[in-house]
């Protein structure tokens, strides 16, 4: 693990590896070799891992389980320019099969791999890399060319942790494992789709890094376009990774290039989130006082496939919003004729399917029902599926699933070269456009201008209670 003392390793990777160890899912003779620029020995690294597990492990810290895990942990310090890294690691890495995790900035990917190749450590090894996969289409293509000089595509695992979430995986089962669902999952029934990735935290201390990315590159290019591809893809010929990837690429290649008029970019100013004052983005250390980097994006997309032609897809993401929520909402078309006119309701509420990805994973379906009584009075109601209530278990964290799959060599939940480049191609016209940002206070729903990308109506409110919360509140 390169970057083994960094934030990602401590919050996600080490706790996930600990959970896999406790479950007996790591190779019996496997070792975990951490490397970073900090001068640490094996003991120091194990203590960092101990604190990370205590704070972030899904099932909590357990002394005996950790001691078994800690025996696998070793550490080698490296230099900032990676010189001599290969020779150091060659002495430490004796096992023939290696999974190399690059939890480092993208600019370090190629220098590290070239150093490892020179030491003979990339032969037979697989690598895992984190987003962003390039800065634009040109740099993404260049990165892939450079990676392929060191390792072949079949041994590259590009990780998007959203794909490791249970509900994202369940989306495929929900769609293709239920005849009723698949029959309504198209332009004949669906009027519009809204995809949301909302975060209630701001940039915090990552100002300098975020100035180089922004929400388009950080969230839209990967998380949101992956969710859209899974929502729109046709049934694959099998559940084989290549078959799944082919269908997702077809969707991405069918998206019309986004035009600047279909995009609203926003940037948060000082405000209050969950009762805490949040400084404005331009107040964060490392951010230009005149920055036009977007912390919010709302966008209209068109997917020109047989199933989805004419259906508008609206995607949005943002930092420092009123709540943390990731969901996909499919709004169905109105009924062709209102048979219940004169009952006090002028328009029936369209059916809606909601896939909740976080914070509480689940799926709900809203429909019209008659209220009890002598007269016909319609009211929207919901059927709700919650992972926590239905399975009485806590889903594994995304990194647990993804690390386990990478160890097994399973590419199903990872992103391929063609997907990465297709997603960048969609955004090229917007990335080349000089941005104008609309401001919104931290703790709000985002900029008012965001509604301008909608052909009709408004965005659904982020601050609404989840369907399962409402259902629980209504119980006696």
List where the protein language model places each region.
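Secretory/organelle targeting and membrane-embedding segments
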Residues: 1-128, 133-476
């Amino acid at each position: 693990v390169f970057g083994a003392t960094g934030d990602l390793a401590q919050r996600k990777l080490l706790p996930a590896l600990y959970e896999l160890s406790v479950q007996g899912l790591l190779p019996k003779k496997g070792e975990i070799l951490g490397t970073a620029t900090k001068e640490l020995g094996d003991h120091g690294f194990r203590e960092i891992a101990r604190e990370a597990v205590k704070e972030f492990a899904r099932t909590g810290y357990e002394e005996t389980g950790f001691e078994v895990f800690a025996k696998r942990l070793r550490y080698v310090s490296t230099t900032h320019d990676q010189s001599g890294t290969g020779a150091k690691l060659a002495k430490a890495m004796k096992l023939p099969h290696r999974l190399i995790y690059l939890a480092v900035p993208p600019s370090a990917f190629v220098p590290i791999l070239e150093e490892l190749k020179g030491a003979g450590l990339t032969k037979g090894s697989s690598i895992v890399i984190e987003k962003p996969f390039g800065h634009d289409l040109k740099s993404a293509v260049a990165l892939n060319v450079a990676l392929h000089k060191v390792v072949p595509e079949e041994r590259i695992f590009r990780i998007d942790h959203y794909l490791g979430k249970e509900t994202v995986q369940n989306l495929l089962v929900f769609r293709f494992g239920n005849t009723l669902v698949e029959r309504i999952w198209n332009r004949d029934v669906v009027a519009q789709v809204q995809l949301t990735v909302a975060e209630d935290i701001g940039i915090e201390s990552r100002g300098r890094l975020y100035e180089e990315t922004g929400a388009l590159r950080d969230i839209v290019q990967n998380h949101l376009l992956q969710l859209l591809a899974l929502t729109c893809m046709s049934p694959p010929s099998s559940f084989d990774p290549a078959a799944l990837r082919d269908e997702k690429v077809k969707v991405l290649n069918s998206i019309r290039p986004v035009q600047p008029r279909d995009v609203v970019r926003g940037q948060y100013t000082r405000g209050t989130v969950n009762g805490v004052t949040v400084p404005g983005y331009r107040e964060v250390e490392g951010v230009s006082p005149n920055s036009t980097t977007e912390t919010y994006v709302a966008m209209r997309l068109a997917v020109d496939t047989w199933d989805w032609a004419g259906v508008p897809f609206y995607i949005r993401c943002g930092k420092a919003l009123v709540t943390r929520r990731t969901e996909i909402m499919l709004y169905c078309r109105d009924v062709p004729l209102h048979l219940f006119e004169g009952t006090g309701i002028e328009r029936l509420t369209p059916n809606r399917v909601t896939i909740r990805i976080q914070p509480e994973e689940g799926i709900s379906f809203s429909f019209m029902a008659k209220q009890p009584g002598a007269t016909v009075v319609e009211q929207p109601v919901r059927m709700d599926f919650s992972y926590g209530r239905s399975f009485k278990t806590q889903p594994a964290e995304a990194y647990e699933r993804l690390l386990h799959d990478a160890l097994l060599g399973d590419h199903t939940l990872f992103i391929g070269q063609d997907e990465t480049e297709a997603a960048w191609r969609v955004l090229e016209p917007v990335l080349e456009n000089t941005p104008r940002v609309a401001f919104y206070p931290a703790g709000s729903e985002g900029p008012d201008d965001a509604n301008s990308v909608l052909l009709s109506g408004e965005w659904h409110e982020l601050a609404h209670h989840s369907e399962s919360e409402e259902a629980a509140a209504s119980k006696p």
